[in-house]
A protein has these predicted regions:
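Conserved donor-nucleotide/metal-binding helix-loop-beta segment in metal-dependent transferases, i.e.
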Residues: 75, 80, 92, 96-122
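Short acidic donor-binding/metal-coordinating loop in glycosyltransferase active sites
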Residues: 42, 65, 90-92
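Short aromatic/basic micro-patch
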Residues: 5, 94, 131
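Glycine-rich, basic loop-to-helix element that forms the pyrophosphate-binding segment
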Residues: 68-75
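Active-site oxyanion/phosphate-handling segment shared across diverse enzymes
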Residues: 132-174
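Short aromatic/hydrophobic "clamp" motif used to bind/position activated sugar donors
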Residues: 85-86
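N-terminal glycine-rich phosphate-binding loop and ensuing alpha1 helix
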Residues: 1-41, 45-48
Length: 174
């Protein structure tokens, strides 16, 4: 909610007349490969309307650090104990559950730590998905030292010298 370029963007109404975050959560709920959808947001007071809204919708909410998003994800994962984490940002109301499922399948079928469709990006903006193991997240949480790595969650995990990664490539570069 604290975006400097577009404040409160996740609570802005989208074409369906619902807040953007609700559209994202509804679409993610259509995934056949995602067992649980959790909003991981910060403890900043300006996020309370978002937290209350998502809680009222019946989704789990985890609150953590505003700046250290890697820590927020790690602490959420500790609480919910997933085998893998699927990361979708809250400003992607057109996220396609079929693309999410394809990324999870790629993760499950290959012996990898990290799968995404963003390295290089061949899908349209707004369809970004990342899937990574809890163990890779834990290593990143322990070893990542730069502010950039801690603020952006996955740059450390995308290190191909340390982790096995795969990129999901769209058949037509959009």
């Amino acid at each position: 909610m604290g975006s400097t370029r577009f404040p409160n963007k996740t609570m802005k109404l989208v074409s369906a007349g619902i807040p953007m975050i609700e559209a994202v959560l509804l679409r993610l709920s259509q995934s056949k490969k995602v067992d649980q959808v959790i909003l991981a947001t910060s403890t900043e007071l300006n996020n309370q309307p978002l937290v209350d809204y998502v809680d009222k919708l019946g989704y789990d909410v985890f609150q953590g650090s505003e700046r250290n998003v890697l820590d927020r994800y790690y602490q959420a994962a500790l609480q919910y104990n997933p085998d893998a984490v699927v990361r979708i940002t809250g400003d992607c109301p057109l996220i396609d559950p079929n693309i999410v499922d394809a990324a999870v399948r790629m993760y499950e079928e290959n012996d990898v730590d990290y799968v995404s469709n963003t390295n290089p990006p061949t899908y349209p903006d707004g369809l970004d998905v990342e899937v990574f193991s809890f163990s890779a997240l834990k290593i990143a949480w322990i070893e990542a030292k730069t502010e950039y790595d801690r603020e952006h969650v996955t740059p450390f995990i995308r290190n191909v010298e340390k982790f096995k990664t795969e990129n999901m490539i769209n058949s037509a570069d959009c």
